[in-house]
Amino acid sequence: MNKIAYLQCPTGISGDMCLGTLVSLGVPVAYLTEKLNNLGIAEEYKLRAEKVQRNGQEATKVHVDLLDHHHHDHEHHHHGRHLPEIEQMILQAGLPPRAEAWSLAVFRQLAVAEGSVHGIAPEKVHFHEVGAVDAIVDIVGTCLGLDWLGIASDNAGFPLLYCSAFPTGGGTVRAAHGQMAVPVPAVLKLWEMRGCPVYSNGIDRELVTPTGAAIATTLVKEFGAPPPMTIKQVGLGAGTINLPIPNILRLWLGESANLQANITDSAANSPTLETISVLETQIDDLNPQAIGYVFEQLFAVGALDVFTQPIGMKKSRPGILLTVICHPETLNDCEAVLFCETTTLGIRRTTQQRAVLQREFKPIQTKYGTVRIKIAWHGQSPEKVITNVQPEYEDCAELARKHKIPWREIQQLALQGWYESIQNSK
């Protein structure tokens, strides 16, 4: 059975309401605080929860209290956080892998929307200090809570989370740029980007915040009616104000047995979702003989993959697009190689997620020597499915050179040896 969840938003959605539903379902505030403090913001906020009444119904209200002493220490510094800084905080926090990947994706989605509204690149979006702390706690806390509840992942690594249509709200709200119409521009852009269904419930207040919209539009699999499910628990997260109807976000937690067979009920059976960094630069004036050396230096400092693509550049000059894929912790080293060994004046950085099959190496003895076989699979025993088997290139090349025989002969002998070992083990 797959654990899935459904967000019912009769009065909209915000980050603190999401946290309220999760705490209501049993996610410990102490757990959230412990993990959030690894982001380096422990002195900037305090997280607390309480039971409140909304139109006679009890729900959980989560508060993100900003600590006054930190605000006063920094109020004259005009300090804020941009997307790359927040991404680096998340990457260095040691969060559970799914929570890390989801948090990065939500912040990227929010920055893309805000950047589109203001006509700037996502990396240039400035999160005001107070707003940034709120957003970090709300977004990362929500991702931590969904992971803690054990909600299953789909093939792309995102939670099996569903959501109702959004009420649009109405009226105006005061923001950093003055009075704004509701829904505010960032929320409208997020709805547009995802193609969300919306409707009016007649309440002229801000019902959907940018943070709440970013969480939903990034993590939700489908919008609309609830999926077929057996409800096991319902979490109730309270909004801040009283409205004509109970201002409560409801998170239904349950099970479904009607999903496609290739969607697993745990992250362990799915490809691992990991965070990678991608560097790109376009070059049209580098000696082609230098490219091979650049590759060697990049792999020496830890690049996972390096490749080039032919491109046409300005003034009709032919050039190359040089792309480097690496782990975030080796990004600076790879970037330093590019600046040192190429003629580039600028490098683009992006953070992405990739799904990686489980893999292992098995040594196989051939008559010419040992060759390591890389084996990739998905699923768990006894339903483990092997999807790829490849002899290591360098092992085959070394033996081919040593014995002066074709590389393909070594490769075929290694594969034959692996297949024979599988047959003998049955």
UniProtKB/Swiss-Prot annotation:
Single GO MF descriptor: nickel cation binding
Intrachain disulfide bonds: none
Keywords for the protein's UniProt record, in alphabetical order: Nickel
Transmembrane segments: none
Pfam family, one: Ni_insertion
Family as reported in the entry's similarity comment: Belongs to the LarC family.
NCBIfam families cross-referenced by the UniProt entry: nickel pincer cofactor biosynthesis protein LarC
Name of the protein in its database record: Putative nickel insertion protein
Taxonomic lineage from the root: Bacteria, Bacillati, Cyanobacteriota, Cyanophyceae, Nostocales
